[in-house]
Amino acid sequence: MKSVDNTSELVKEISDKFVKEYCKSLDDLMLVIREELQNAGEITDTELELHILDLANTLYFTGSAQENLGIKEDTCKAIRAELYNKTYEDSKGTVAQKNALSELATQQETIVLNIYSRAYKKVKLRMDAGYEMLNSLKKVMNKRISEIELSNSRYIGGNRNE
């Protein structure tokens, strides 16, 4: 049990380190938006435009970082499979014994694979939340534009009738 706790804590710490590194800009921007919403209540049009542009840009670079994690995950899978197969080939005994030896030989690679896999999933979750925020900001902007257009059409329409 203690071994599981230690290993899982190690996986969590290292994957969190990757996530912090790759998502720092996105996390910082999401915190700024949250603080503005909590403190000011309403974001100005200029701030809204800036956040839409900044968030789209940040998501682009975070997506690139996520793909780098995916590449590392794929590479780790290949290395693990290669070691597993080599150990299986070189082992003597029954199929069950060969499988057990191969699994034992690839424990470290499996842990590294889990680290990259968890980090990839965590970055993806943050990116998904970032896209949700971006879509929400766009909806707010579109609503404001519609309200302005409606107001202008009433004003212009009112002038024609006078």
Task: Report residues per predicted region.
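Long, highly charged low-complexity segments enriched in Glu/Asp and Lys/Arg with interspersed Ser/Thr
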Residues: 22, 28-29, 129-150, 158-162
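Long amphipathic alpha-helical coiled-coil segments
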Residues: 77-82, 112-144
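Amphipathic alpha-helical coiled-coil segments
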Residues: 58, 62-66, 70, 106-127
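Short acidic DE-rich linear segments
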Residues: 1-5, 153-162
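Extended, amphipathic alpha-helical coiled-coil scaffold segments used for oligomerization/tethering
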Residues: 70-115
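Amphipathic alpha-helical interface segments
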Residues: 46, 65, 72-75
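Extended, charged low-complexity scaffolding/tethering segments
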Residues: 1-43
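Short, charge-rich amphipathic alpha-helices with coiled-coil/heptad character
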Residues: 31-61
